[in-house]
Regions:
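Sec/Tat signal peptide C-region and signal peptidase I cleavage site
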Residues: 15-19
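N-terminal, post-signal-peptide region of Sec/Tat-exported proteins
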Residues: 38-68
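Short beta-strand motif characteristic of blades in beta-propeller domains
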Residues: 32-38, 79-85, 135-142
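Conserved small/polar residues in nucleotide/adenosyl-binding loops
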Residues: 167-168
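Sec-dependent N-terminal signal peptides
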Residues: 4-13
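Structural signature of eukaryotic scaffold interfaces centered on beta-propeller domains
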Residues: 72-74, 129
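Cleaved targeting-peptide boundary
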Residues: 20-25
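Extended intrinsically disordered, low-complexity coil regions enriched in Ser, Thr, Gly, Ala
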Residues: 47-52, 92-102, 149-158
Length: 169
């Protein structure tokens, strides 16, 4: 009986650890969800029949903090913005039902806006907020108040950008 209890306790711990690392995001296409590894930034499209595709490979191979990456839904039903809440890097993530040729993760900002140390606990340092313009988000550094405009596009990936709006020292 004691062994059974220990086994059950280990299973609960393993299940809760898994639940914290992976987060499911509903999409407006009810047959599909996105699964985000919040430690590494890997994104998979999961279809309700069990099929899955990798949209975005791991962005942080040595990811050791749960909740580091987050997806933000846009007004375009096929597009999310992925944010590294430690560094401010962000990507446009697009899923599709037309096939893998239409699934991608394109970098919007590949440069770190902050440089955390190994001991830093910077989860949620950076946050994004939607604006009235469907193509634009505001990126906030909650530690110092700096702001950036983040723009995505479904037509031309050359129109992706992240520009500083407010810089405080």
């Amino acid at each position: 009986m004691k062994k059974l209890f220990v086994l059950f306790a280990l299973m609960v711990i393993a299940f809760t650890s898994y639940a914290q690392v992976y987060k499911m995001y509903k999409t407006r296409n009810y047959h599909n969800q996105l699964r985000l590894n919040t430690m590494t930034g890997e994104v998979q499209q999961i279809q309700d029949d069990g099929q899955s595709w990798e949209i975005c490979s791991a962005r942080e191979i040595l990811g050791d903090k749960e909740g580091r990456f987050r997806l933000y839904e846009t007004q375009n039903m096929w597009t999310f913005i992925m944010l590294d809440t430690y560094t401010g890097k962000n990507w446009q993530v697009q899923f599709s039902v037309k096939g893998e040729d239409y699934m991608f993760a394109a970098p919007i900002n590949i440069f770190s806006l902050a440089y955390p140390e190994k001991s830093s606990n910077w989860t949620n340092r950076f946050q994004m907020f939607a604006t009235d313009n469907m193509w634009t988000f505001i990126l906030l550094d909650s530690y110092n108040g700096r702001l950036w405009q983040v723009q995505y596009s479904t037509q031309d990936l050359d129109n992706l950008f992240c520009i500083c709006l407010l810089y405080t020292s």
